[in-house]
């Protein structure tokens, strides 16, 4: 279309380049895991810390952000780590800004939970709950029951201050889950996914399956789960290790997508190199997922899962001007690389 170009506009020569919406990373820890012993996204003092928020752990000056900008990632959903069974509240941030307040575009996005070896390893080694998968399920269910009771007492008080239960920020956050204002974002692999599905059904709460290695064993259960917001798969480059990491079935993305599940691909950065996200997406193409569908798993799908598709994830009038230019076609060409990243209409990286 011939559009009027204002005098102040920057003209970008993009002949031969591939333009697409800014990449949305649906599961990340950027800005919160620094060098050495810095674990600001893991409050490992209690097995359940629903009151804490990832927002307060993010260092806007972290070197993670220039790295992900160079990779074409314009928005990250930043979650607490998986040391605790209930890790805290999740937020979404743009990759550029002078402060976390300026960068954050949604808080909260979800409440982080974790199953399996991570919380078992943290607390079992201290001879504390949870030492087993039984214990993990008990921690989640008991906290949901407490929050349900708290909510019922609030409703019964009918606004009378003297009848209200003592204020509890953690329970308030879990009540957001029970009211289905936000989903739980669950670190889980293999049969731990079935625990997530059972608990979500029991309490009628929305959820995402994060990592989801081994999903190919449970297609029918996952695809029929009524409150599933999406599957956030990856990182796909993880080694085939014993136990939970033993089945990195990237081919499941084609089946889940074809059967109507909203799928996204994560970096888990900075734990895994965020620059590898496009290469990981290429693995999904190699193993059978159509290229156009894989690009959606990097853009509009994670935006939908985070409840941000009104702002990001596609190039449409009225949405944020988050655009990336690639030399080569990402997830299709091995040599494809990001050569320009635009966030909120401003070029923040150019090769």
Predicted regions span which residues?
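N-terminal metal-binding scaffold of metallo-dependent hydrolase/deaminase domains
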Residues: 1-6, 328-331, 346
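Conserved beta-strand scaffold positions in the cores of enzyme catalytic domains, especially
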Residues: 9-13, 110, 341
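Polyanionic/metal-chelating signatures
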Residues: 64, 69-207
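Metal-associated gating/positioning segment near the N- to mid-region
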Residues: 15-80, 84-91
């Amino acid at each position: 279309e011939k559009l009027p170009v204002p005098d102040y506009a920057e003209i970008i020569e993009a002949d031969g380049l591939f333009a697409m919406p800014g990449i949305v990373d649906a599961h990340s820890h950027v800005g919160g895991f620094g060098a050495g012993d810095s674990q600001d996204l893991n409050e490992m003092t209690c097995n359940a810390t629903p009151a804490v928020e990832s927002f307060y752990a993010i260092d806007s000056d972290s070197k993670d952000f220039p790295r992900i900008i160079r990779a074409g990632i314009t928005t990250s959903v930043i979650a607490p780590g998986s040391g605790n069974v209930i890790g805290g509240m999740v937020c979404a941030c743009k990759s550029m800004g002078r402060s976390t307040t300026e960068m954050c575009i949604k808080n909260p996005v979800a409440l982080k939970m974790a199953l399996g070896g991570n919380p078992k390893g943290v607390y079992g080694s201290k001879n504390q709950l949870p030492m087993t998968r039984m214990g993990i399920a008990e921690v989640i269910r008991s906290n949901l029951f407490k929050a349900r009771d708290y909510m019922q007492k609030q409703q019964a008080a009918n606004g009378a201050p003297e009848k209200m239960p003592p204020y509890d920020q953690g329970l308030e956050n879990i009540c957001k889950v029970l009211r289905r204002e936000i989903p739980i974002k669950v670190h889980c692999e293999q049969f731990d996914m079935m625990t997530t599905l059972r608990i979500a059904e029991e309490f009628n709460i929305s959820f995402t399956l994060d990592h989801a290695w081994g999903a190919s064993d449970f297609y029918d259960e996952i695809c029929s789960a009524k409150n599933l917001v999406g599957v956030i798969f990856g990182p796909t480059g993880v080694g085939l290790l014993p136990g939970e990491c033993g089945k990195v079935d990237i081919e499941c993305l084609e089946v889940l997508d074809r059967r109507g599940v909203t799928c996204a691909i994560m970096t888990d950065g900075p734990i895994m190199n965020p620059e590898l996200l496009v290469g990981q997406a290429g693995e999904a193409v190699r193993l059978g997922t159509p290229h156009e569908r894989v690009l959606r798993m990097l853009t509009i799908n994670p935006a939908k899962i985070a409840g941000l598709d009104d702002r990001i994830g596609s190039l449409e009038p009225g949405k944020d001007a988050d655009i990336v230019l690639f030399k080569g076609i990402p997830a299709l060409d091995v040599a494809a690389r990001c050569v320009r990243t635009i966030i909120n209409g401003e070029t923040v990286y150019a090769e």
